[in-house]
Regions:
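Catalytic domains of carbohydrate-active enzymes that cleave complex glycans
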Residues: 1-58, 131, 147-253
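Catalytic-core regions of glycoside hydrolase
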Residues: 1-147
Length: 253
């Protein structure tokens, strides 16, 4: 019985002290009535669970359910519905608002064909959006022989994983993973600067790295994406990093 199983899971996470970390996730629901009914069943069966929904249709915003703690629109929705999402973020301070990339957009992303600076830019993008984080659906979704061939179906190579299996049972970090980590560090530096009230420094970084600062302009007709959102120059990103470090050093002295 599925309800007994769900209830058992809830009790396990409560007993192990992990219930606050658990999210019951919905992935791009298209049938809102079916989604709502399923959500109601789980709520009644396991009331302690929290909920997370990744959505790729802007219409979902008109069907947002109370009780969902984590919202994650895809890149297209995050940009095209930015003002509406920021309003929702303000109205629901106890919720987390993330955004995600997956098999799209083609740019910026973390495919094998993607410039490594695209992965690093994702940290800057999150700071620009002012959201609570980035969701990437893949980490270890490996093919049968990922060290030889990571192509799968119609997905772009690299879409399914950011790391590879090591012979010792651990993982091998890809250059894409390392570039993303660098971008996360950039984001954390910007957030520390924001906490210290230096919006002028943040604006300086955005002016330096971005060719277009209005995210609403990133989405073109037919869901095409602006092709040159940021300055694709590693030296400029390192210049921005040094500006952030220098300013933080001065603020904390």
């Amino acid at each position: 019985d599925i309800c007994a199983y769900i209830s058992g899971l809830e009790q396990y996470f409560i007993k192990t002290g992990q219930i606050d970390r658990v999210r019951v996730a919905a992935d791009e629901p298209g049938d809102f009535e079916r989604y709502r009914k399923s959500l109601d069943i789980v709520r009644k069966t396991a009331p302690a669970f929290r909920y997370k929904t990744a959505f790729d249709h802007a219409e979902f915003l008109d069907h947002c359910e109370e009780g969902i703690t984590d919202y994650a629109p895809n890149f297209y929705c995050a940009c095209s519905q930015y003002e509406q999402l920021k309003k929702m973020q303000k109205e629901r301070p106890d919720s987390r608002l993330q955004w995600y990339i997956c098999c799209g957009p083609g740019y910026p992303n973390t495919f094998l064909k993607s410039d490594l600076l695209e992965a690093r830019f994702l940290g800057i993008m999150n700071a620009l959006l002012g959201f609570d984080g980035l969701l990437r659906w893949t980490y270890t979704c490996w093919t049968d022989h990922p060290l030889e061939d990571i192509r799968y179906g119609n997905w772009r190579a690299g879409d399914l994983c950011l790391v590879y299996p090591a012979k010792n049972g651990g993982i091998l970090k890809s250059l894409r993973w390392k570039a993303l980590k660098r971008g996360i560090e950039d984001y954390e530096l910007l957030e520390r600067i924001r906490e210290l009230g230096r919006e002028d420094v943040i604006e300086q970084i955005f002016h330096l790295l971005l060719r277009e600062e209005n995210v609403s302009n990133y989405i073109l007709e037919d869901w095409e994406v602006l092709s040159d959102i940021f300055v694709n120059d590693y030296a400029v990103f390192e210049q921005a990093r040094q500006i952030m470090l220098n300013n933080l050093e001065g603020m904390l002295e």
